[in-house]
Amino acid sequence: MKIFVLIFSLFTFFSINIKAQVEAHFYSHTQFGKVEKKLVNKNINTTFKPLIFNDIDSLNFLYNENNNELIDNKFLNFFYAKENFGFVVSPLLNLSYSIDKEDSYSNNSRGLLLKGFVGNKIKFQSFFLENQSFFPNYLDSIVRFTRLPGVEIVPGQGEARPFKNRGFDYSRSEGYINYMINNNLTIQFGHGKHFIGNGYRSLILSDNTFSYPFLRLQTNLGIFRYTNLYTEFMDIRNNQLSIIDGYQGWSRKYMSLHFLECEINDRIKIGVFESIIYAENHAPGVSSLDINYLNPIIFYRPVEYSLGSPDNALIGIDLKINTSKNQFLYAQLILDEFTLEEMKSNNGYWANKYGYQIGYKFLDFLDVIGLNTNLEYNLVRPYTYSHWNSSSYGHYAQPLAHPLGANFDEFIVKLDYYYQRFSVNFKYNFARVGLDDSENLNISYGNDIFLDYNLRSSDYEIDMFNGIKTDITNLALDFAYLVDETNSLKVGVFVRSRTLVNENSDSNESYFGIYLKTDLFNYYYDR
C-alpha cells in the first residue's frame, strides 16, 4: 500500500493523455458546450471524462486543425515543440469582484498549467492554483459547516485556512500521465477528478469533490469501451484524526469502479456501472487495500456478500440516445439498495435507495448556430449513498455524485449562446430538499450522506423531502469575451441570485460582478 501511495504522490504534478485527448477535464461545462457539437457529429464518446481518444483529433488544443502543427498563439503562453516532444505553459487566473446591497466579495486565484507530449503514446498535464476568497454569505456558511471544529472545506477545492477577517486561503493541484500501451488499452494515473454522464449533473460520479489519487484503465474492444477506476479518498466527516499503529491523519477509504459502455448503433449508447467503497482497515498485519476488489472483470455485489456485506456498493445505468444530428436524450439510474417486494407495497421503505436523471440537449437550437439548450431533472431518494460506517459515497466532506447529497429533486434549464469569441450563458436551478437538522446529529432524514443511516427516523413511511422541506432557487447569467483560446482566458460580467425558503428561514442573495478567468474548471456553487 505504501508503494501504491508513493506512486500516486510522485505524479501529483503531472498529467497524461493518450494519442490525443481532448482536454475535456480542463473545460468547464460552459467551454465544453463549444466543442460538444463537433464531438457528437464525430460520434466520439463523451460519457467518461476526461476523454481519451485513439486518434489525433483536431480538437486537441496543441494542434492546428489543418496541419497538426502547434497553434501559433503566444499570448501569455510559452510553447516549445520538437518532433517527439513538446509542451506549453499557460497562466491560470480567476480574478473576480462582486457586490450586493450591503457587501462586496472577491476571488484571487493564480496558477500555472503545463501540458505536453512525449512521442505519440505519452501526454501529460499538470496545474497548480493558489487562492484567496471572500464568499457570499450562503457559500461562506457552506464552507464553514463541516461539523468538525476548525475544519473548513471549500466545495471542490479542499481545506481552507482563515484569511484576514472573513476570507479563506486554499490551494489545489492536479495532474496525470497517460500512456497508450496499444490501440485498445490505455493506462492513466495521477491526481484529479472524473465525471460520468452527458449532463450538467452526474448521479454516478462527478467532479464536485476535491481531487484524489487514481489509477484508470481503459479498454476499447469494438463497440465496447470498458473503464476500471481505482481511487483513494479521505474521510474527514465521520472519522477525525486517527492515531492507530503509528498512523496519524485523516481516515482513508478506497473505491473500485467498473464502467462498461456499449455503442449499440450510431444513435444509442448504453453504459453499466458498479462501484464499491470500503473503509481503511487498521488491523495489524492487514493491508488497507482489499485485493478482492482489484479484479478488473468481476461483479462487486457477489464479492461484497461473500465478505459479509461490510462495504458500500452501487450499481446503475447510463443512457444516451441521439434523436437527430444535434439533439440527444440522456438518462441515469442508480441503485444503492433495493427490495422489489417493498417497492410494490408502496410503503416508503427506507432501504429502497435509488436515484435517476433525465435530460435533453438541443445543439444549435431552432437552427440558430451556437445556441445550445439543456433541460435536466434529477431525483435521489433519502439515504442513498449513505452507509453505517465511513464508507459513504463521499470524499473530503463532499458528495461524490450530486452536490445536494440525497433526499432531493432538481430541475435545471441551461441556455448557452456562442458567437465568435463572445458568449452568453444562462442557468436556472430549482431544487426541493429534505434537509437534516444541523442542531441534532442523533437523527438522519436522509439528506446528509455522511450521517449513519442507522440514525434514520423510521424504517417505513420515508417520503421524499422528509426532514426540513426546503426550496432552493439559483439563477446565473454571464456575458463574456474569449481573450485566449489556448487556456480559455475570458473577461466577463455576471449576475447571481440564490433564494432559500423553509419553515425555519427565508433568505435571498443577489449580486453582480466582473471577472478575468481561465474558464477550465467547474465550480458547483449552485446548491
Description of each model-found segment:
Residues M1, L10-T12, F233-I236, A431-G434:
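Short regulatory "switch" loops immediately downstream of catalytic or recognition motifs
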Residues M1-A24:
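Bacterial Sec-dependent N-terminal signal peptides
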Residues S9-L10, F61-N67, E461-F465:
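Short, charged, low-hydrophobicity "junction" segments
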Residues V22-K269, E274-E280, S345-Y354, K361-H387, ...:
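Outer-membrane beta-barrel channel domains
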Residues Y170, E263, I268-R527:
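Exposed, low-structure sequence patches enriched in small/polar residues
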